[in-house]
């Protein structure tokens, strides 16, 4: 009888959950919030890297832009940029080269792969150059060569020391032989500066390779390097296939080069400004 029928134990609901509940968005973590350290492979909260961009676990130094390095190195509000507005003539009419340059300029805020000018470091005036690997891997083309050459010529005329932070993937292939001639062009300007008994300090950063290594990067009176910076001419695989030997794991690292006499000292990023200031003072730095 219906009067005494047993009630269901459960309440029946619509099995289609979307009909009564709106789907919740999946939580997302912004890409720029964390980074994986190439050295220790740990995932690091960006804020833990600090302004110096150094891994708190293993001390690996992340690559930084020219403007970031400028802020870490020079006295506040002392930098005056020079030699801007120089543009390549695109000698090979390389496909899409000018479009690529325009895009990279917009992305980096730089006109080329090297930032040049004068600045004070610990109160001492220097001619300063900082290469930026974010700009087509800081490859050396005609404009990079011209800016660095003019920097040395200016420093020679004004009797200033030169401090140059190097970083490069080598010569800029889009400019062919014109890029290669920059090696000799800059080296000649370095030689004139040296003949005037003026101080030239290079700071090798990751990566410094190719024609930059084969010329002005290794011509400094003192050659500094950041720890674990990759410094070399040809690539590791190219060398191994040529000599048919397995190279050491630390081959082309700054520490390996120091052991073999190619680098004078290795300095942690946090100590570079102080160390550069000391070296300038020892070599008769001019206070402004």
Predicted regions span which residues?
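Residues immediately within or flanking Cys/His clusters that coordinate Zn2+
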Residues: 34, 52
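Extended interfacial segments that mediate partner engagement and assembly in macromolecular machines
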Residues: 71-125, 131-136
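Short, intrinsically disordered, charge-biased short linear motifs at domain edges
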Residues: 21-28, 39-46
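Short cysteine-rich clusters marking metal-coordination/redox-active sites
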Residues: 37-40, 55-58
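Cleft-lining beta-strand/loop regions that shape enzyme active-site pockets
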Residues: 115-194, 201
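Short Cys/His-rich "knuckle" micro-motifs
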Residues: 46-50, 63-69
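Conserved catalytic cores of soluble enzyme domains
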Residues: 169-288
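N-terminal alpha-helical interaction blocks
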Residues: 1-25
